[in-house]
Amino acid sequence: MARGPKKHLKRLNAPKSWMLDKLGGVFAPRPSTGPHKLRESLPLIIMLRNRLKYALTGAEVKKIVKQRLIKVDGKVRTDTNYPAGFMDVVTIEKTGEFFRLLYDVKGRFTLHRITPEEAKYKLCRVKRVQVGPKGVPFLTTHDARTIRYPDPLIKVNDTVKVDLATGKIDDYIKFDSGNVCMVTGGHNLGRVGVITSRERHPGSFDIVHVKDSQGHSFATRLNYIFVIGKSTKPYISLPRGKGIKLSVAEERDRRLQAKSQH
């Protein structure tokens, strides 16, 4: 009888967004339970060892986090498998570095360097709005935050700007046509564009049409859309490439151009 939660994760079954090589052993670190889903998170050990190269082994990562040097969303995290996810702010005070976890257009997690000013807040997608005991309204966000007494105009699928020091809502962005958004799932993962229209399909998935700054249009499901700014001005800085997916031919031309300049 298998009782209790799974404790292992095979490397071949690990999410592609972690960019682990197939031949690096049998197992991958299994993220602990936390605010993000297993397949939508990046454990601290992979962040520090495989991406930032601050450690060579898992034991070294453990020594770093146990010194309470790593903060996620302003809170010290000492678990090497802590699941940091989309939009989380990772702070390493000893080196004075701040990162925001975002996706690149190839659907991989990227640690995007940000300024200390930008590290004070994060954007959260509203997953549900409810009324709790004694009639207290509250909303739940994509990173499992519960925020009480929100502005009554905030609805599901909107985005709230949360101050990490207080956990309070500073501002919110409505889910509207004309606002800039990032795609957080599916085939178009990591692309950034402006919402052009929304098709309602009761009983199925609503489809949202998005147009990027190059004029390419694509469609995705409503629950993959994360609004990141009003009109075309995002509230966060974007990683290199600005969320514009190039076609295979465009990528090839760019590579050849870079090669010819060397």
Swiss-Prot record:
<comment type="similarity">
    <text>Belongs to the eukaryotic ribosomal protein eS4 family.</text>
</comment>
<dbReference type="InterPro" id="IPR002942">
    <property type="entry name" value="S4_RNA-bd"/>
</dbReference>
<dbReference type="InterPro" id="IPR038237">
    <property type="entry name" value="Ribosomal_eS4_central_sf"/>
</dbReference>
<dbReference type="InterPro" id="IPR041982">
    <property type="entry name" value="Ribosomal_eS4_KOW"/>
</dbReference>
<dbReference type="InterPro" id="IPR005824">
    <property type="entry name" value="KOW"/>
</dbReference>
<dbReference type="InterPro" id="IPR013843">
    <property type="entry name" value="Ribosomal_eS4_N"/>
</dbReference>
<dbReference type="Pfam" id="PF00900">
    <property type="entry name" value="Ribosomal_S4e"/>
</dbReference>
<dbReference type="Pfam" id="PF08071">
    <property type="entry name" value="RS4NT"/>
</dbReference>
<feature type="domain" description="S4 RNA-binding">
    <location>
        <begin position="42"/>
        <end position="105"/>
    </location>
</feature>
<dbReference type="GO" id="GO:0003723">
    <property type="term" value="F:RNA binding"/>
</dbReference>
<dbReference type="InterPro" id="IPR014722">
    <property type="entry name" value="Rib_uL2_dom2"/>
</dbReference>
<dbReference type="InterPro" id="IPR013845">
    <property type="entry name" value="Ribosomal_eS4_central_region"/>
</dbReference>
<dbReference type="GO" id="GO:0022627">
    <property type="term" value="C:cytosolic small ribosomal subunit"/>
</dbReference>
<keyword id="KW-0694">RNA-binding</keyword>
<keyword id="KW-0699">rRNA-binding</keyword>
<dbReference type="GO" id="GO:0019843">
    <property type="term" value="F:rRNA binding"/>
</dbReference>
<dbReference type="Pfam" id="PF00467">
    <property type="entry name" value="KOW"/>
</dbReference>
<keyword id="KW-0687">Ribonucleoprotein</keyword>
<protein>
    <recommendedName>
        <fullName>Small ribosomal subunit protein eS4</fullName>
    </recommendedName>
</protein>
<dbReference type="GO" id="GO:0003735">
    <property type="term" value="F:structural constituent of ribosome"/>
</dbReference>
<dbReference type="InterPro" id="IPR032277">
    <property type="entry name" value="Ribosomal_eS4_C"/>
</dbReference>
<dbReference type="Pfam" id="PF01479">
    <property type="entry name" value="S4"/>
</dbReference>
<dbReference type="Pfam" id="PF16121">
    <property type="entry name" value="40S_S4_C"/>
</dbReference>
<dbReference type="GO" id="GO:0006412">
    <property type="term" value="P:translation"/>
</dbReference>
<dbReference type="InterPro" id="IPR018199">
    <property type="entry name" value="Ribosomal_eS4_N_CS"/>
</dbReference>
<keyword id="KW-0689">Ribosomal protein</keyword>
<dbReference type="InterPro" id="IPR036986">
    <property type="entry name" value="S4_RNA-bd_sf"/>
</dbReference>
<dbReference type="InterPro" id="IPR000876">
    <property type="entry name" value="Ribosomal_eS4"/>
</dbReference>
